[in-house]
Structures are given as structure tokens and as C-alpha cells.
Amino acid sequence: MKEELSIDIIGLAGACSYALDCIEAEFVNIKNKHGKRVAYISICMAEYWKIQGDELQDLAMCALLHDNALTQYISEELKKDSVINCKKDLSEKKTNLHCIYGEKNITKIPFKTDVSNVILYHHEHADGTGPFQKKWNEIPLFARIIHLADTIDIIGNNSWNFICQYLLKNRDGLFDSECVNAFLHAFTHSESFMCLSDGSFETKLWEIIPRQKQVFDWKTCKNVADFFAKIVDY
């Protein structure tokens, strides 16, 4: 008899995201619930393209797990040098490795749609000045969405006017026009954006994302467990 297990895969991705939050807070001073905020911004932007169902769930999982290789990268760097500036090093030198490792790791997760190169290219800039010099039309849509959402959250500025000015200033530079338009379509005023600060976004996140338990064989379950182990074992 074939052994199988029923799993809420998106809920598990949320748990992995929490583990990543703890690690990012320790090493790179990223504020709490970063992955979930990136996921919330991403799925709100997705409405612009009418992304629904399996695609929306896979976008949310990619967003929740976009920094999945952080511990793997930091662990390797610490083996070389016990004193490193992780925040500076990640942002300036080794972003490409963080993306390469993350893309490889994510293949262990049972997505329903094709998410190839989403994690690999999630730090690319629309004008081709990112780590792999890919321009916006060479980058998967999900990667472009996550890149904008990730950047907005890392900025950490709650001023709606500042965010709008920043996006318009970097339109067709850091971000493509479609994604800028999608963000401004999703968050039309400061009140809609403020839920990211008051914590209410998390309830809204789980209300929007399609969730249901799926049945997986033991090999898939082991792959998922191995993925989680890479995050917490450092």
C-alpha cells in the first residue's frame, strides 16, 4: 500500500516563513513578519492581472519563501570568516548566490504551476542592472512582483507619499511600469497600506490565499522536510 500524508502546504510555507523571520532578525536586522508582508503585498498586486487559484497560491508560497537560502549562504560565509557584515554582504556582493541557492532549494516544494526562475530572478531590476542583468521582459512576472514587494517592505517607511514618490522615481529603473501600476492599483490610499503596520494584514493574507490540504507521497514529504531543515539547521 502506498504511504501518503495530507498536508496544508501553504500553512507549512507560513511556518517556514516564521523561521526565516527569526533568522533574518538575528543576522540582517529585517523586521518581523517580512515574508508574510511580502506575500500580502504580492497577492494584492496579483489582482491587477486577475491571478487566481493555483497560481495565486504558488505566488504566495514563492513570496513567503523568497529568502529561503539566507541561512545556507550565511553558514558558508561564517565558515570562511567568523566576523562578517551579513547585511552589507548580502546586499552588495553575493545576492546572486542567495538567489541561485534559493532557486535550487525551492524545487523540493510541490508547486502546482511552473515557478521556474521566480526565486532566481527576484532581485533583478527592470532596466537590466540586477545581479544577472536580466531586463523586465526576461523576468517571470512572479519574480517582478516579489522584487517590488520585497523592496517596499525592506525600505520600512510607512509614509504613503514617500512610497509613491519612490516607486514613480524608480519606474522603468528598479521596477517595470506594470508592477508599479499593479501596486498603485492594489493600494490606492494610505489607509489601505497602513494595514502592513498595524498587523491586520496577516488575517487578510490567510483570507485571500486559497488553502486546502493536499495528499503527498512520502518522497515529497521528505523533500519538504529537507527544505525546512536547510532553513533551521545553521
Region spans (language model):
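Histidine- and acidic-residue-rich, metal-dependent catalytic cores
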Residues: 2-234
